[in-house]
Amino acid sequence: MMPPDYVFGLIGHPVSHSIGQIVYNRYFQKKGLNAIYLSIDIFPETLKYFMSYASKMDGFNVTIPHKISIMDYLDQIDWEARSIGSVNLVKTEDGLLKGFNTDYYGIEYMFKKGGVDVSGKSIVVAGSGGIARTVIHYLIKNNAKSVTVKARDVKLAKNKLNAYDVDIKEYANNDYDIYINCTPLGTEAVGDPFPEVQFGKGKIAVDVVYNPPVTPFLKRAGISGSKTLSGLDLYIGQAIKTLDILTSGCDIDTLINSVRVAVNEVR
């Protein structure tokens, strides 16, 4: 068996829920690319050791909890990622580690595909990590009326999000137009970020979690008559941009088919 020409992967903790290994390896196989994609579980305290060897890989995605802390180890950071303050993709070029944020494109893809315009809307976001920063950046850039963050630790969230003009509260209420989950709650069908909220017609529920595609939060909101947007579309959107950066192009139909196969395999 020939060794791969390119080694890509995902780092995070945990990574057991990720469909990336199935998606990208199937995509590479279908496109005839001699490449491999690995899932690598990296504890926060061992990130610095991994990064000392990271340039041996051709590129890797970054997920919770490393999207912010990884920026300290990179040689270059794309202007969009730097302005957001979060990196979810690293590419090795000429021995240098370059950081990008493809989540932003995934968020844009998800809202456009779902036919949701955030302009003039009052919005609450659960979470204050890297993906929350990216979502907030998108909302402000696209003229949301107001953005509130729901966080368990208000002081910590204020420190993390001090670059943004947002209100931070411990609880949400029924007064918002759009509710967005940017926490791991719902992964593997466990947890609800907005248990205190009563959903109904006219409200929109959005989840960045993609496994499962319909989380308990989205299911509850959908049953109540609210419009729902799945994190699976965010995943597809960011994967399109990821492949553009790592392989200089993306066959969108092949990618979407690979995602569908992966979702069916992990059910």
Curated annotation (Swiss-Prot):
Binding-site list for NADP(+): 127-131, 208, 231
Active site: 67
Gene assigned in the entry: aroE
Entry-linked InterPro entries: Aminoacid_DH-like_N_sf, NAD(P)-bd_dom_sf, Shikimate_DH-bd_N, Shikimate_DH_fam
Domain of life: Archaea
GO terms for biological process, alphabetical: amino acid biosynthetic process; aromatic amino acid family biosynthetic process; chorismate biosynthetic process; shikimate metabolic process
Similarity-based family: Belongs to the shikimate dehydrogenase family.
Residue intervals passing through the bilayer: none
Keywords: Amino-acid biosynthesis, Aromatic amino acid biosynthesis, NADP, Oxidoreductase
Gene3D superfamilies registered for this protein in UniProt: Leucine Dehydrogenase, chain A, domain 1, NAD(P)-binding Rossmann-like Domain
SUPFAM superfamilies for the chain: Aminoacid dehydrogenase-like, N-terminal domain, NAD(P)-binding Rossmann-fold domains
Self-association and partners: Homodimer.
CDD domains listed in its UniProt record: NAD_bind_Shikimate_DH
GO cellular component annotations of the record: cytosol
UniProt EC number: 1.1.1.25
Residues annotated to bind shikimate: 63, 88, 103, 210
UniProt KW Amino-acid biosynthesis keyword: yes
Pathway(s) per entry: Metabolic intermediate biosynthesis; chorismate biosynthesis; chorismate from D-erythrose 4-phosphate and phosphoenolpyruvate: step 4/7
Enzyme category, top tier: oxidoreductase
Single GO MF annotation: NADP binding
Name the record gives this protein: Shikimate dehydrogenase (NADP(+))
Catalytic activity: shikimate + NADP(+) = 3-dehydroshikimate + NADPH + H(+)
General function of this protein: Involved in the biosynthesis of the chorismate, which leads to the biosynthesis of aromatic amino acids. Catalyzes the reversible NADPH linked reduction of 3-dehydroshikimate (DHSA) to yield shikimate (SA).
Family annotation (Pfam families): Shikimate_dh_N (PF08501)
